[in-house]
Amino acid sequence: MDTKFDDVLTGEQKLRNFNINFGPQHPAAHGVLRLVLELDGEVVERCDPHIGLLHRGTEKLMETRTYLQNLPYFDRLDYVAPMNQEHAWCLAIERLTGVQVPRRASLIRVLYSEIGRVLNHLLNVTTQAMDVGALTPPLWGFEEREKLMVFYERASGARLHAAYFRPGGVHQDLTPRLIEDIEEWAEHFPKVLDDLDGLLTENRIFKQRNVDIGVVTEKDILDWGFSGVMVRGSGLAWDLRRSQPYECYDEFDFQIPVGKNGDCYDRYLCRMEEMRQSTRIIQQCLAKLRVEKGDVLARGKITPPPRAEMKTSMEALIHHFKLYTEGFHVPAGEVYAAVEAPKGEFGVYLVADGTNRPYRAKIRAPGFLHLQAIDYIAKGHLLADVSAIIGTLDVVFGEIDR
């Protein structure tokens, strides 16, 4: 008998699930993500992420460079908010060497970390809206990001790969004019957020595409190792800036937005509110920077001497030459330094062996841990929901593939 038909009477055929490739050149794939989806009709049965298309061997390359030469690699991980990654690397080196960062440098770091957070959330919220069909938000969001990119450029000389944070402080001071301009931007930015709010938050279609999609429970968070907005969207108030304060975050007055349902919509709301809180921190930072004067680098073995000193002192010139050729030596030891990056907990586990190069540096990218759960989260959803889920996981492949 022909086995093609299961049931002789009804003549029903055996159903075969349908496999499709989502990405790597799909606009909603956010970079070079390739998902192999197994579909039963339009329902996702399996969602298999294939990563590694942007793998550059960063962690291995870092073992052959000096500590200072390794800094720019961090800009190229999460290239949406580069300075937040540099921060973790600098903190790791400072903990091993015991360097005290000057207060003004500490404030500038917090300022630019929060600008990075706004840069990231603006991109994420608006492109996620585009993934579910709203075409106006990205245009507005990129207009604001452009202004912030200019602030990056005016501080460091580069719009994207800044290499501005240095072990011991920041590369150069901010001009009074730049501080005024950031202040002016921070005053009008909440109005832009209100406009975005008006477009999306109560939009019926946006809600239908996001509410109860990609729900993550507290147990899932602990099982999969989530961090950042993925945690806070589900009701856990875990933010490293508050729970394990680094730099001078403990001086600032800000709130941690927390969701309730752990779905895509709550994560969107968290990101919107985080931008408001970041603006508050930026304003407090600027007020402190007006009062706090002083150097922006801890002058010593791991930082270059001032330019003026190099013109007159032979020792300063030798120090400068040695610093940029041989680099500084970090005492043997191991340390884990983590920052609350926009996407979650970005950590660096650094093992030093007393030389001028790291023995091993392990980078903990939050997006990597979020993407590993895509099969678990997307199973049972419709094909159209996959792009909404990827959007709120907030994945960037620089840091996932490393």
From Swiss-Prot:
Topology term for the membrane: Peripheral membrane protein
GO cellular component: plasma membrane
Main location: membrane
Reactions the enzyme catalyzes: a quinone + NADH + 5 H(+)(in) = a quinol + NAD(+) + 4 H(+)(out)
Matches recorded under SUPFAM superfamilies: HydB/Nqo4-like
Cellular compartment(s): Cell inner membrane
PROSITE patterns: COMPLEX1_49K
Keyword Ion transport in record: no
EC number(s) from the headed UniProt entry: 7.1.1.-
Gene Ontology terms, MF aspect: NAD binding; NADH:ubiquinone reductase (non-electrogenic) activity; quinone binding
Key words, A-Z: Cell inner membrane, Cell membrane, Membrane, NAD, Quinone, Translocase, Transport, Ubiquinone
Pfam families, A to Z: Complex1_49kDa
Complexes and interactors: NDH-1 is composed of 14 different subunits. Subunits NuoB, C, D, E, F, and G constitute the peripheral sector of the complex.
Similarity comment text for this entry: Belongs to the complex I 49 kDa subunit family.
Function description: NDH-1 shuttles electrons from NADH, via FMN and iron-sulfur (Fe-S) centers, to quinones in the respiratory chain. The immediate electron acceptor for the enzyme in this species is believed to be ubiquinone. Couples the redox reaction to proton translocation (for every two electrons transferred, four hydrogen ions are translocated across the cytoplasmic membrane), and thus conserves the redox energy in a proton gradient.
Name of this chain's protein: NADH-quinone oxidoreductase subunit D
